[in-house]
Amino acid sequence: IGVAEREDEMKNNGRTPVAVFDFDGTIISGDSFLPFMRYVVGGWKYYCGMLFLLPWLGSYAFGVIDNRRIKEKVIGYFLKGKPARDIRELGESYAESFLHTKEKPKMMAKIDEHVKESHILLLASASLLVYLKPWAEINHFDGVCGAQLEVDGEERITGRICGNNGFGQEKLDAVTEWLAERNPDKTYAYGDSQ
């Protein structure tokens, strides 16, 4: 799992409280991963691709393949070979122009409360850092745990995830490690899933 932090982030020597937020289904309505693929390739290519991926999606739905494998199949189909710089730019644009339309007002108010209290904020998700990190920076988060796209020597997307996927236990392990480094006196957690 990739972890991104703001440049000015320090260890939590003052033992400031930490608020940990899940993303998909908690801060935003629904999923961010598949809409990002549609955002990158456009509607027609996206729907054709989803038809092609249907057997894999069915295998995932029935538990035949795991979350990482289906995610890499989708990434490979839609993003493999694309310049990493282009995908980073699209991730920033997606964070600024699309994700805010899916934000849940109650959760955004909760984030604002923690920001006003000067709490440290961590965004923890199995979604892609390429758009989570810019969204988190806009919304005053101090750190982000998410899935990092693998990039080859020519700065192109390989279609794989670099490191852990950040789903289920991997997400919990990343958050636990992040919290252990800061030793907060209090932790708030917001989520809707594993």
Residues covered by each model-derived region:
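Metal-dependent phosphoesterase signature
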Residues: I70-K106
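Active-site neighborhood of HAD-like aspartate-dependent phosphohydrolases
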Residues: R6-D66
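Conserved alpha/beta cores of soluble small-molecule-handling proteins
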Residues: G43-Y46, G63-D66, P83-D86, P105-K106, ...
